[in-house]
């Protein structure tokens, strides 16, 4: 799943990049 991949890179990317999660 895509959200699973985002959760994995969430530790690498800054919180400001959370907009890409949409």
From Swiss-Prot:
Cellular location(s): Secreted
Free-text comment on the cofactor: Binds 1 Ca(2+) ion per subunit.
EC number: 3.1.1.4
Biological process terms in GO annotation: lipid catabolic process
Top-level EC class as recorded in UniProt: hydrolase
Known cofactor(s): Ca(2+)
Activity versus pH, per record: Optimum pH is 8.2. Stable when incubated for 10 minutes between pH 2 and 11. Retains 70% of its activity when incubated for 10 minutes at pH 1.5.
UniProt GO MF annotations: calcium ion binding; phospholipase A2 activity
A cellular component annotation (GO) from this entry: extracellular region
Catalyzed reactions per annotation: a 1,2-diacyl-sn-glycero-3-phosphocholine + H2O = a 1-acyl-sn-glycero-3-phosphocholine + a fatty acid + H(+)
Thermal behavior of activity: Stable after incubation at 70 degrees Celsius for 10 minutes. Retains 80% of its activity after incubation at 80 degrees Celsius for 20 minutes.
Keywords: Calcium, Hydrolase, Lipid degradation, Lipid metabolism, Metal-binding, Secreted
Function: PA2 catalyzes the calcium-dependent hydrolysis of the 2-acyl groups in 3-sn-phosphoglycerides.
Similarity-based family: Belongs to the phospholipase A2 family.
The protein's name in its UniProt record: Phospholipase A2
Species in which this protein is naturally found: Struthio camelus (Common ostrich)
Gene: PLA2G1B
């Amino acid at each position: 799943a895509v959200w699973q991949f985002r959760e994995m890179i969430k530790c690498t990317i800054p919180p400001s990049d959370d907009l890409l999660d949409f």
